[in-house]
């Protein structure tokens, strides 16, 4: 009986409503002397790390910085530290292994996770387990998490549902829904931009890294997701 109740509680928790960012919004509205530094952490691979055309890193033309600018425009009283714990070439499996040491140790107020591009060559079950491990660890410390679907890749067949990039995007959407965490569906916006007639070469700096225009698309998608979750003026 106890095992059935445990399973039921897991299922109920899994289908919880997405996290509400109203408390974080209130924190960002707090003025001196009652305010404090707010830690915003971006975890993932080379894209949030700021790589454009490898090995060049353009921190100020990459979505973590662009989101930082948008946050400061909306919350002029807030002290906001944007920290990138991303590592170029990494996938979610080693990313999960270092999550507590490199991410939770920073005492973040919100965490963004972006690994789909590099997860394509990893086994499905290990990828899902890694994402779930990071989400669970964040939930245990009551930190809101935002999952990111990928930016594009010129080698991917974006119109093929069975393309590995589409499959990874679908997995992330499923995990976000099941776990009741936030999602910024960058991949959906990216594909919509392509469908409007924009060549991928105009939003990529190389085969798998966005340029400023591509990072701007990602940042706008992320910020919209935050606003919809309660991050409002």
Annotate each PLM feature:
Residues 114-118, 134-169:
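Active-site segments of SGNH/GDSL-like serine hydrolases
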Residues 25, 64, 68, 96, ...:
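Extracytoplasmic/secreted envelope proteins and their assembly/folding machinery
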Residues 10-18:
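Hydrophobic h-region of N-terminal signal peptides that target proteins for export
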Residues 1-4:
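Positively charged n-region of N-terminal signal peptides that target proteins for export
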Residues 151-233:
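Catalytic His-Asp segment of secreted/periplasmic serine-dependent ester chemistry enzymes
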Residues 19-85, 98-107, 198:
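Serine-esterase "nucleophile elbow" of acetyl-processing enzymes
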Residues 39-41, 72, 78-106, 118-148:
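Internal alpha/beta domain cores that form substrate/cofactor-binding pockets in large enzymes
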Residues 47, 55, 84-90, 112-121, ...:
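Cell-envelope and extracellular/periplasmic
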């Amino acid at each position: 009986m106890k095992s059935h109740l445990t399973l039921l509680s897991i299922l109920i928790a899994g289908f919880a409503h997405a996290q509400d960012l109203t408390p974080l919004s209130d924190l960002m509205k707090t003025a001196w002397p009652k305010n404090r530094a707010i830690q915003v952490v971006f975890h993932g691979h080379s894209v949030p790390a700021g790589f454009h055309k490898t090995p060049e890193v353009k921190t100020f033309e990459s979505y973590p910085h662009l989101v930082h600018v948008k946050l400061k425009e909306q919350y002029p009283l807030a002290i906001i530290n944007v920290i990138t714990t991303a590592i170029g070439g990494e996938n979610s499996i080693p990313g999960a292994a270092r999550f507590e040491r490199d991410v939770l140790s920073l005492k973040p107020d919100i965490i963004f996770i972006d690994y789909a591009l590099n997860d394509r060559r990893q086994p499905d079950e290990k990828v899902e387990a890694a994402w779930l491990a990071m989400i669970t660890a964040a939930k245990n410390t009551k930190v809101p998490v935002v999952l990111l679907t990928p930016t594009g890749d010129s080698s991917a067949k974006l119109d093929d549902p069975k393309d590995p990039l589409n499959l990874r995007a679908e997995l992330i959407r499923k995990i976000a829904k099941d776990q009741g965490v936030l999602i910024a569906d960058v991949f959906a916006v990216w594909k919509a931009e392509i469908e409007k007639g924009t060549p991928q070469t105009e939003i990529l700096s190389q085969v798998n890294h966005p340029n400023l225009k591509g990072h701007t698309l990602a940042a706008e998608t992320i910020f919209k997701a935050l606003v919809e979750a309660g991050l409002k003026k």
